[in-house]
A protein has these predicted regions:
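Domain-level signal for soluble alpha/beta catalytic cores
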Residues: 1-305
Length: 305
């Protein structure tokens, strides 16, 4: 570890610009389909080498923070949306395996060049339906977070938050779990072009919902790609008391599954974000690749921030 590398991810987010990794599920879509699995998270148990290779590709591209392959690894989400009735033991194993694998990849990278990397444990976004038990959702969120923490993640990152009620539950779970394991929390929302959450609510409501978890960062992800993303980020920056993270998707795919935003688009976006001091970490979401992250990393490196 270099002397300039803080051991705490919260401190890193306060003092310099970090590079986040890019998409997971879209990058693993082919492997998921080939394995006849309903979602990419299950690759962590069935075909871990595919996930490990993706982590390494993002680290090689310059990512300082990589994400666990656990976007849907919540027992109630698996049951309600994928009709996959799984035991608590299986869900725990997915999250532990994902965390352990990502941590091992960062340790290997650090051993090679002495640079500290971090692992964000990705927490599923939730949207309770009328009649759902809030306590059941809270328990499911806590179970996922505890397994990620026990697997060694540095940060619990609840991403793609798209409704306020669900975000409040996730934040309550994080407020209970994070102090127990002495790890940090962060939240990222996907929002419409008008700045509202897809299921209703303003950014002010989001910030109110997550405050209970004392997050180390709050940001935006996915949205509709880098076009217009900086404008949304400016709005969040003016409202939020927390460091900001930024990782848009590569836009909406066409009928052939091709995403419109290329690595150069992400490099240009990163230049604007850095020039305006809009984010403490920059990366990519759906449709992005190691090439997109390499473009961001080059801009961050050249900026010296």
């Amino acid at each position: 570890m270099k002397p300039s590398d803080p051991d705490n991810i919260a401190e890193t987010l306060r003092i310099r610009t970090s590079v986040l990794d890019g998409a997971t599920a879209t990058m693993l879509a082919e492997a998921t389909a080939a394995a006849h699995l309903p979602l990419a998270d299950l690759l962590c148990l069935e075909h871990p080498k595919n996930v490990e290779a993706l982590h390494k590709a993002y680290l090689d591209a310059g990512a300082d923070i990589i994400s666990t392959n656990t976007f849907n690894a919540n027992a109630l989400i698996l049951e309600k949306f994928y009709h996959a009735k799984t035991s608590e033991h299986v869900v725990e194993n997915i999250n532990r395996a994902a965390a352990s694998m990502a941590c091992q990849c960062t340790r290997h990278a650090a051993a090679h060049d002495g640079h500290r990397r971090y692992v964000a444990g990705i927490v599923a976004p939730i949207c309770p339906k009328p009649g759902d038990s809030a306590e059941e959702w809270l328990d499911a969120c806590q179970a996922q977070m505890a397994a990620l923490a026990e697997g060694g993640v540095d940060l619990l990152l609840a991403e793609s938050c798209y409704n306020i009620a669900g975000t409040r539950i996730v934040a309550q779970a994080a407020a209970r779990i994070a102090p127990h394991y002495n790890i940090c929390t962060a939240f990222s929302a996907t929002i419409n072009d008008n700045g509202t959450l897809p299921m209703g609510g303003e950014l002010e409501d989001l910030l109110d919902a997550v405050a209970v978890a004392s997050p180390s960062a709050v940001g935006l992800n996915c949205c509709n790609g880098p076009q217009g993303f900086v404008r949304l980020l400016r709005k969040l920056k003016t409202l939020s008391p927390y460091p900001t993270i930024a990782y848009p998707g590569a836009g909406l795919p066409d009928s052939a599954g091709r995403y419109p935003a290329n690595p150069q688009d992400f490099g240009q976006m990163a230049r604007t974000i850095i020039a305006e001091d809009l984010a403490s970490a920059i990366g990519g979401c759906c449709g992005t690749t190691p090439a997109h992250i390499a473009a961001v990393a080059q801009v961050v490196h050249d900026s010296g921030k």
